[in-house]
């Protein structure tokens, strides 16, 4: 399916998705956090979409908000999609887990939690992955203060 066709089909869902203006190889959209799980489930289960492969999950700090970028591929239809979601709550950032849709999300969500502090509702075992439980803060956030000078900016 071409990006234009994908955009038309996803626009019909009427869940507040916004499409990126810039031209890219992958169609890119932003979804409101309250509609993330619904959209992701639809992307995988709709026979015309069949996004069966979640190949990358990236945490982001956009300054005023924190979020996640998901890269999806349909191995059936050979199309790709980038889905962005964000929350303005920097003190207690919470998004829905997509682990129940793609089990590969388990590791990725642990990494995002560890470095950005974004919690995922319904994750099977959310915990620190690389950093010790005693580690203070989230080192990939823009406001992280490295008191030990271990990170060179």
Question: Where do the PLM segments sit?
Answer:
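Terminal low-complexity/charged segments
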Residues: 1-153
């Amino acid at each position: 399916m071409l990006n234009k066709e994908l955009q038309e089909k996803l626009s019909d869902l009427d869940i507040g998705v916004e499409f990126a203006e810039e031209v890219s190889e992958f169609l890119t959209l932003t979804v409101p956090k309250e509609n993330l799980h619904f959209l992701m489930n639809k992307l995988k289960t709709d026979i015309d979409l069949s996004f069966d492969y979640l190949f990358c999950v990236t945490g982001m700090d956009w300054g005023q908000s924190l979020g996640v970028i998901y890269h999806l591929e349909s191995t059936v239809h050979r199309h790709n999609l980038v889905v962005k979601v964000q929350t303005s709550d920097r003190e207690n950032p919470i998004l829905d887990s997509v682990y129940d849709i793609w089990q590969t999300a388990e590791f990725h969500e642990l990494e995002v939690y560890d470095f950005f502090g974004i919690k995922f509702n319904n994750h099977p075992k959310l915990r620190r992955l690389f950093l010790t439980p005693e580690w203070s803060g989230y080192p990939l956030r823009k406001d992280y203060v490295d008191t030990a000078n271990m990170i060179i900016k």
